[in-house]
Amino acid sequence: MKRGSSLKYGLLFSAIFIVFFSVSLLLHLPASFALKHALKVRGLQIDGVQGSIWQGSASNIAWQRVNYGSVQWDFQFSQLFKGKAELAVRFGRDSDMNLRGKGYVGYSMNGAYAQNLVASLPAEDVMKYVPNIPVPITAVGQVELTIKHLQQGQPWCQAGEGTLTWSGAGADTPLGSLDFGPVIADVTCQDNTIAAKGAQKTVQVESEFEASLTPNRRYATSAWFKPGAEFPQAMQNQLRWLGKPDNQGKYQFTYQGRL
């Protein structure tokens, strides 16, 4: 009996030791080791990895030869009780786009998600990714995207809600400068259809706009603008090329197509 009891206790202590050793090893597993043995993704490069897979950082993340800067992460263990694997992240330092951001990203039974995520960059840098415009334009101000919640879908998102803000918005052109004031747009996603609606108003110009993008990559936009009392005269002289405004003084535009 004593020998049997000793054997049982020995197996029990061995099992406890193995469990604690495995947990300790997992908790202290270096992120660089995990990255080295992870599946390689073409076009993705991660440099300067430090810390563990639970709390660590990378000095730079590059995707398709664009540097998105550093990233820091901190695993949220409390979310495990909700069936989620979630990270608190900060990103963007030293990025090519002067991008900055922070928030929460994770994975649940419904797929990948993001919440309370904020990302911002100068409007001037945003213009680098806009198709060529016939008239030279320099944008000023800061563009900020706030994602309240976003749930992964195919090809875009199953559900989501956020706000796109252009603060200190303005544009400098050879014909003069425009002050847009704050430009605010509400952005939603429902069943992989993305929609945005926004407006702005200053003494120079007033406008509203709507845009949508469907799962089959078809887009539709509509917008109008109305010159204000202090609209630059040089620009006023060029409005004749846009045709006549409606009876409210608004110039209307609509576009649709496929990406």
Annotate each predicted stretch with a short phrase:
Residues 1-13, 37-39, 173-259:
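Extended terminal
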Residues 8-27:
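Hydrophobic membrane-insertion alpha-helices, especially the h-region
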Residues 29-51:
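Alpha-helical transmembrane signal-anchor/signal-peptide segments
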Residues 44-136:
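N-terminal beta-strand/beta-hairpin edge segment
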Residues 59-61, 74, 90, 144-146, ...:
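Residue-level recognition of well-ordered beta-strand positions that form the cores
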Residues 65-73, 94-102, 129-148, 177-184, ...:
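Amphipathic hydrophobic-ligand
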Residues 87, 160-162, 221:
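Transmembrane beta-strands of outer-membrane beta-barrel proteins
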Residues 99-180:
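Non-cytosolic head/periplasmic domains of membrane-anchored proteins
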